[in-house]
């Protein structure tokens, strides 16, 4: 199982939207996906209809009162399971009353140990991280194979992103490979075009692939449908497919590129609840990635 953490120290860069669309794209390609929503806001959990009941699930999991299998929830989207958000966990973790949990986190291996229990059950685990930088994040960085950082191509965002990546690369606690990509790109803006044209000249961690700012991407939280379910034919899909292909090439994950080419649908073994979060016909086909 490959572990990818979607992270940025600041909010508003599209971490959750990217998480949801990547999960649905990978499931559509036939990969089994575990989504772990570590953002207390719970956007990813909301999308899949699996909002947490604020019962300290994460705290009890890390304190070994629960197993990871007890907190994993199935979804109506075939091939995607979710560990939903826990809005109380961050506050409790930082609270003095949670000293035991904090001590358990100090070795920064607890997240990795927890995910190792399901490493043979999924192809990919995607973690939707909260903004900021806490001890929790160091645990995530230790567990993740890839730290994927969405960023907006604007001066302050680029400056802050460079500082963040330099700090992460010099940190002994960060074991992950670090890659970044431009998100919410508007090519009609001269500054966005400028940063697109200069990427990779000085920073080889910035991917060539980018995700544009399209209304259909922005609307996924309202419709509770990823772009891979809203439209059968959409050029937006291709941007995510190209992004994933470049990630796999940089990470040498060739076995995860269109490996099975199945179609996301509702599990035949477990009929979806009514109404389902995602509805797809059996004849929906995956858009082929363009080489252009």
Task: Walk through the language-model features, giving the residues of each.
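P-loop NTP-binding core
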Residues: 1-292
């Amino acid at each position: 199982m490959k572990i990818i953490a979607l992270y940025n120290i600041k909010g508003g860069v599209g971490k959750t939207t990217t998480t949801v669309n990547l999960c649905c794209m990978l499931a559509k390609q036939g990969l089994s996906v575990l989504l772990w929503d570590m953002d207390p806001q719970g956007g990813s959990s909301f999308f899949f209809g699996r909002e947490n009941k604020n019962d300290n699930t994460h705290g009890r999991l890390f304190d070994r009162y629960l197993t990871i299998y007890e907190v994993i929830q199935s979804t109506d989207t075939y091939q995607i399971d979710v560990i939903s958000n826990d809005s109380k966990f961050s506050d409790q973790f930082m609270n003095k009353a949670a000293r035991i949990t904090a001590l358990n986190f100090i070795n920064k291996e607890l997240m990795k140990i927890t995910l190792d229990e399901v490493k043979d059950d999924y192809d990919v685990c995607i973690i939707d991280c909260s903004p900021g930088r806490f001890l929790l994040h160091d645990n995530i960085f230790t567990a993740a194979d890839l730290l994927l950082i969405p960023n907006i191509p604007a001066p302050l965002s680029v400056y802050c992103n460079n500082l963040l990546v330099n700090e992460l690369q010099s940190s002994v606690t960060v074991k992950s490979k670090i890659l970044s990509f431009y998100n919410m790109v508007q090519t009609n803006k001269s500054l966005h075009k400028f940063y697109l044209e200069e990427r990779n000249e000085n920073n080889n961690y910035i991917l060539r692939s980018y995700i544009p700012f399209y209304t259909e991407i922005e609307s996924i939280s309202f419709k509770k449908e990823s772009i891979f379910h809203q439209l059968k034919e959409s050029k937006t899909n291709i941007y995510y497919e190209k992004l994933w292909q470049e990630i796999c090439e940089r990470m040498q994950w060739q076995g995860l590129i269109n490996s099975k080419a199945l179609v996301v649908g509702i599990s035949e073994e477990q009929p979806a609840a009514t109404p389902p979060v995602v509805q797809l016909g059996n004849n929906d086909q995956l858009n082929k990635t363009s080489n252009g």
